[in-house]
């Protein structure tokens, strides 16, 4: 066991995977010599050399396209895009080739690649440096989308993603890269993709979140516990495919449902989760489901970020309102 940060857990997972499997290559803008803009891959080029860990030009299309080609031809690429808001030049290759290759070739080719994306806000950076774009990935058939909220989950989910035969988008909540430490096993282990985690048991309502927002929800729940409100918290872990079973079992127990995310409200993942609950657990609901999201705006400048993303006090207010709701 070692007590490490989420960032260190990701680095450890990549390091151990590369040591075990020589087909794994790591690359991206500054991902080699500098270890990435957040230093997630620091030390890997020195250990494994410039052939397996290398820098790329500022060309996201080339990064994603190269990863697809490598994966088809027997390598296991781990490609990094500096921020998820930079993905757009590479989106065509991700959707039309990475996500569809298995179906297009009727299983003759698979694309075992991982696309790492620092995700969401929290660093007071402008626009495309702070976006939460999970809707762009979760709606694409053929892509798996995961995001950790703890160092333990970061290592286990990333190792599962690396060993998956199909493309996985790995969203890294950058606001908690170094926000806290946790005991993480030194050995390799996997957390199944597509399986959510019940973070806290509760009886009055179910609240689902993922990534860095799980921590904000935990803080909010502490604010309302003294008022006698019992909240069950679920960390989604995998945005696609959704673990419907865990969520539905919880909602059938609590009777109320809420989703908290920093992603936009319109056409976002919160809407998808609420629709799923309405379709499959409607008669168990004691009140209309609630979503607390980011606003439908471009991510604001640094001074406005606090108001744009869900904060514990505001989440607590939504919880109190839902707790009082009656059929």
From Swiss-Prot:
It catalyses: N(6)-[(R)-lipoyl]-L-lysyl-[protein] + pyruvate + H(+) = N(6)-[(R)-S(8)-acetyldihydrolipoyl]-L-lysyl-[protein] + CO2. SUPFAM superfamilies: Thiamin diphosphate-binding fold (THDP-binding) (SSF52518), TK C-terminal domain-like (SSF52922). One of its GO terms (molecular function) is pyruvate dehydrogenase (acetyl-transferring) activity. Its EC number is 1.2.4.1. Its cofactor is thiamine diphosphate. Keywords: Oxidoreductase, Pyruvate, Thiamine pyrophosphate. The keyword Oxidoreductase applies. Thiamine diphosphate binds at residue 60. The keyword Oxidoreductase applies. The pyruvate dehydrogenase complex catalyzes the overall conversion of pyruvate to acetyl-CoA and CO(2). It contains multiple copies of three enzymatic components: pyruvate dehydrogenase (E1), dihydrolipoamide acetyltransferase (E2) and lipoamide dehydrogenase (E3). Heterodimer of an alpha and a beta chain. This is Pyruvate dehydrogenase E1 component subunit beta. It comes from Acholeplasma laidlawii.
């Amino acid at each position: 066991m070692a007590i490490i940060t989420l960032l260190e857990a990701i680095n450890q997972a990549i390091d151990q995977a590369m040591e075990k499997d020589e087909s794994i290559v790591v690359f991206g803008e500054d991902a080699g010599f500098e270890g990435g803009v957040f230093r997630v891959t620091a030390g890997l080029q020195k250990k494994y050399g410039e052939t397996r860990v290398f820098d790329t030009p500022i060309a996201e299309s080339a990064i994603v396209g190269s990863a697809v080609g490598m994966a088809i031809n027997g390598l296991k690429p781990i490609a990094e895009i500096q921020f998820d808001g930079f993905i757009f030049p590479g989106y065509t290759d991700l959707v039309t080739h990475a996500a569809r290759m298995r179906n297009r070739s009727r299983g003759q080719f698979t694309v075992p690649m991982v696309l790492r994306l620092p995700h969401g806000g929290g660093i007071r950076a402008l626009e495309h440096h702070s976006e939460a774009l999970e809707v762009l990935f979760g709606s694409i058939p053929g892509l798996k989308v995961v995001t950790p909220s703890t160092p333990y989950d970061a290592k286990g989910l990333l190792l599962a993603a690396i060993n998956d035969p199909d493309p996985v988008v790995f969203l890294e909540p950058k606001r908690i890269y170094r926000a806290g430490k946790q005991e993480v096993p030194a050995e390799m282990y996997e957390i199944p993709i597509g399986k959510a985690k019940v973070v806290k048991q509760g009886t009055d309502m179910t609240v689902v979140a993922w990534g860095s927002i799980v921590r904000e929800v935990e803080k909010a729940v502490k604010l309302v516990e003294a008022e006698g409100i019992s909240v069950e918290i679920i960390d989604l872990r995998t945005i696609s495919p959704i673990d419907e079973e865990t969520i539905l079992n919880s909602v059938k127990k609590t009777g109320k449902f809420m989703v908290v995310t920093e992603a936009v409200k319109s056409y976002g993942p919160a809407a998808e989760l609420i629709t799923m609950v309405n379709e499959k657990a409607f008669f168990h609901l004691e009140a209309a489901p609630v979503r607390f999201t980011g606003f439908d705006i471009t991510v604001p400048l640094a001074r406005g970020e606090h108001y744009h993303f869900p904060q514990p006090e505001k989440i607590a207010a939504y919880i109190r309102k839902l707790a009082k709701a009656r059929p």
